[in-house]
Amino acid sequence: MTSTPTFREVARLPEFERDLKSLAKRFRTLEEDLATLIKTQLVLFHELGQDNRGVFQITGLPFRDPAIYKVKKFACRALKGRGANSGLRLIYAHFEGADKIELVEIYFKGDKENEDRDRILSNYE
């Protein structure tokens, strides 16, 4: 029997928790949809090497480890009819050697255009 690949650890920054709490008021299924995204899309991308063109590494940062990624294809059931093009964005750090991801930021593209680079730099530089 084969086991399903997962990450050894999934952590959340306090700022991420605040983002999630705020967005969860508008998008009721967000917590559950986030868990599904981590178990499927992120595991496929990092653990099994399958790219669905929904996860992109953020470039132009002054460090390489951890690698910082943005998820653009994020299906949210609360946004009916939009599928993976919901407009939600997830920023996370991937610590390859530790088999760990750390959730940095989540936002709705209609509210904010790009990731908070200052947050990324203050936590990982």
Predicted feature residues:
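Arg/Lys-rich, positively charged N-terminal/basic patches that mediate binding to nucleic acids
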Residues: 1-45
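Residue-level signal for alpha-helical context at structural boundaries
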Residues: 34-41, 52, 56, 109
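Enriched for short, Lys/Arg-rich terminal
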Residues: 2-7, 75-125
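Short alpha-helix boundary/capping elements
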Residues: 42, 46, 96-99
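A short, surface-exposed loop/turn module that caps and links secondary-structure elements
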Residues: 43-80
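Amphipathic alpha-helical interface surfaces
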Residues: 12, 30, 34, 67, ...
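A broad, low-specificity signal marking well-ordered, structured residues that form hydrophobic/aromatic
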Residues: 10, 68-69, 101
